[in-house]
A protein has these predicted regions:
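Canonical Radical SAM [4Fe-4S] cluster-binding loop centered on the CxxxCxxC motif
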Residues: 1-9
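Conserved SAM/AdoMet-binding glycine-rich loop
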Residues: 8-129, 133-136
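A generic secondary-structure signal for well-formed alpha-helical elements
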Residues: 22, 154-158, 162, 233-237
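Flexible glycine/acidic-rich beta-alpha junction loops that bind and position SAM and/or redox cofactors
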Residues: 34, 38-39, 96-102, 133-142, ...
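Short, electropositive alpha-helical surface patch
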Residues: 43-53, 139-155, 220-224, 228
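Short alpha-helical segments and helix-capping/turn motifs at coil-helix boundaries
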Residues: 71-74, 143-146, 213
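Radical SAM enzyme core and accessory elements
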Residues: 210-369
């Protein structure tokens, strides 16, 4: 098979056209799911760098990186001089999971090389990796291990996604569903509900997707536990607000995930408002799911319910709402994190009076900063 490509002259012309007219956005999104795989991408990067230098646009570049071409990715990232945040989607770090989804993943050596370059390129680097929850053969253990793998290789951002069954894909076939005992439910995509007027009639419309919430190796309860961990990682890890605390942990050969597991498994240490946010998060994850498409359509496709979707009373992005709610309790977040670190260290005979004093001071510094 062959890949159709635009010639470089056309690409240059289009970038200049956009740069001259773009006034309200500093970001360019390249809709190539494997940018950096081919030599032409290097030439595109050089052209883009010239455009950036001449027009001071774009400031940021968003593009999904190709896999198993680390040297080329690094070359392109160097050409773009920090404008492109590099990382790689690994879906899972588990070999059996990758085999089940027939995914030729980026090699561990290449993965590490890309992240190392990205992290060394700037003190403010935001390298990333991406993981998908509940795909065939995934389990609570393998999902947590994938998060651990990303942290071990110092990915600054770990993006965790739910598995969507797309019509026409192999994963959505009855054969795959049966083979891996996929448990699925339906939901309205957050922000994808509206009431539209056609002539004299108001028609409620939603966009519905089917997601995997369990399989032969992951129960629904394990799925919810993983979702809670995803909220913790997104809120406590991804935004670099606690990087001094994690730097201290790395010096002790402790990964942030070790602390997050302790935090998740000890709800009795949660400050009251944090406890309520965590509980509401789990409730929302259950409430927004429906066993069948018909059940969801019967519930959603009426004017009263659609207005609730529009007003974000229902059908919310649970991670986004949970994260923003946690940030509104920032001092309590710091208190909980320091308490979790202290508890983990005591549990593993690594605590001392000096360490406890340092942690307390580190917590105060984080709040006052």
């Amino acid at each position: 098979s062959s890949i159709r490509k635009f010639d470089l002259a056309r690409i240059e012309e289009e970038m200049v056209y956009i740069a001259k007219r773009c006034k309200k956005s500093d970001e360019l999104i390249i809709t190539d799911l494997n940018f950096g795989m081919y030599q032409q991408d290097v030439e595109t990067a050089k052209s883009l760098a010239n455009t950036m230098q001449k027009y001071n646009w774009p400031i940021h570049l968003s593009a999904a990186a190709g896999k198993n071409k680390p040297d080329r990715l690094i070359e392109i990232a160097s050409i773009l001089d920090g404008a492109w945040i590099i990382g790689s989607a690994m879906e899972s770090s588990d070999t059996d999971v990758l085999k089940a989804i027939k995914r030729g993943n980026i090699s561990k050596k290449a993965f590490n090389k890309v992240l190392e370059h990205g992290n060394n390129s700037s003190p403010y680097a935001q390298t990333y990796t991406e993981i998908i929850l509940a795909i065939p053969k995934d389990s609570k253990e393998t999902h947590f291990n994938s998060i651990r793998y990303g942290m071990k290789h110092e990915a600054k951002i770990i993006r965790m996604f739910q598995a969507i069954l797309l019509l026409g894909t192999e994963m959505a076939t009855q054969k795959t569903r049966d083979e891996h005992e996929l448990e699925t439910q339906y939901r309205v995509i957050p922000g994808s509900a509206g009431l539209y007027k056609f002539f004299d009639e108001k028609i409620p419309i939603t966009e519905i997707e089917e997601i995997i919430v369990g399989n032969s190796t992951m129960s629904f309860e394990d799925y919810l536990d993983c979702r809670l961990m995803n909220l913790i990682v997104e809120s406590f890890y991804n935004n670099a607000m606690f990087e001094e605390i994690y730097a201290f942990l790395y010096e002790m050969d402790i990964l942030p995930l070790d602390i997050f597991v302790y935090l998740k498994d000890h709800p009795k240490i949660y400050p009251p408002k944090i406890k309520q946010i965590m509980d509401d998060f789990i409730v929302s994850n259950k409430k927004n799911l429906f066993k069948t498409r018909k059940e969801l359509e019967d519930f959603a496709l009426n004017e009263k319910t659609i207005k609730k979707f529009i007003d974000a009373e229902i059908g919310i992005n649970e991670i986004l709402v949970g994260k923003s709610s946690l940030y509104s309790q920032f001092e309590s977040m710091v208190e909980l994190l320091i308490t979790s670190v202290s508890g983990y260290l005591r549990e593993n005979d690594k605590m001392s009076a000096c360490t406890q004093h340092y942690l307390n001071e580190l917590g105060r510094f984080t709040v006052f900063r």
